[in-house]
């Protein structure tokens, strides 16, 4: 009995630790998001005034210092979100107009 209880406690502590680690990672990622957003905007407005969207996408092709890497991950993630939304709107009988726009 004592052994199983010990195993359960160990398991629980591991799970809790894991959860905390994940939470912290997500928290820092979100914190990074905002600072990354601002620095990205500042940086892109320095280089190119008009197209900072293009500049952001070319970012990871040129040079990717670790702090920039997070920015590219962020843009990729937002692209995924848009992709999901796009798929949602192309559901049969939903709105064919949007579907055509996305395909072209």
Swiss-Prot record:
GO molecular function: hormone activity
Keyword entries, A-Z: Apoplast, Developmental protein, Hormone, Hydroxylation, Secreted, Signal
A cellular component annotation (GO) from this entry: extracellular region
Record's comment on post-translational modification: The mature small signaling peptide is generated by proteolytic processing of the longer precursor.
Keyword Nucleotidyltransferase annotated: no
Gene Ontology process terms (BP): nitrate import; regulation of leaf morphogenesis; regulation of root development
Signal sequence residues: 1-27
Annotated tissue distribution: Expressed in lateral root primordia and in lateral roots excluding the meristem region.
Compositionally biased intervals (Basic residues): 41-62
Sites bearing Hydroxyproline, chain numbering: 92, 96
KW Transmembrane (keyword) present: no
Propeptide position ranges: 28-85, 101-104
Coiled-coil parts of chain: none
Region (Disordered): 37-104
Function: Extracellular signaling peptide that may regulate primary root growth rate and systemic nitrogen (N)-demand signaling. Mediates up-regulation of genes involved in N uptake and assimilation pathways.
Family stated for the protein in its record: Belongs to the C-terminally encoded plant signaling peptide (CEP) family.
Assembly and oligomerization: Interacts with CEP receptors (e.g. CEPR1 and CEPR2).
The protein, known as: Precursor of CEP11
Species per Swiss-Prot/TrEMBL record: Arabidopsis thaliana (Mouse-ear cress)
Gene: CEP11
